[in-house]
Amino acid sequence: MQAPLPGTRTGHTRAHYGFDVPVRLGAVPRPLRRFVAGARPEDAVRVAAELVAEGRLVALEPVPGRGDDAAAEFAALVAQVRTAGLVASCELTVPVDRLGRPAALDVARAGLPVVLSGPPADVDAVAAAVPGAALPRADDDTGAESRCRDLAGGHVRLLAGRGADADLAFVRCLNVLMSAAGHPAVATADLRLIAIAGERAAWNGRGHEDV
């Protein structure tokens, strides 16, 4: 289950690489924190390797700039993750509105789990070419529960919203995803929602390898 920890952009062409740390079911060893690994791909890979050595899974969420070097830096990140032997322990978010279908295909070919982000129309267009990619769904979007039901057999990242209504929608969507045969991921830093997700996973017979 995952808490989204995006990087922050400080320039027009450089990318900072944020990443999140999935929390295994039934164990929250310390409060979740925000991590920004640095401005270079090697920074992200170095810190990711440290977390993997602690027994964690890592989700890298690059925030690329809009310059000509954005695609090159992203390609370098993919190559370095693979060279470092982190493919089995990392998933990589591809901002398809900035980097497009080629970047998503490169990640998939490298053997990394892919999470697609961006405007829904862009994500859906790229998803058709990248089977198995995780599709983000916000719990406070109109019709989120219905869309989660349509996608429940695949890999869905559920994004938590804000407020009591969003929390209730989160739980409804969670019930749909956890009871299906897919691979749900939970994107929140709210320990209460993480605990609920753990309870729902256990109720549906899921172990940490199933989420």
Give short role names for the model-derived ranges:
Residues 1-211:
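Positively charged, amphipathic and often flexible ligand-engagement surfaces
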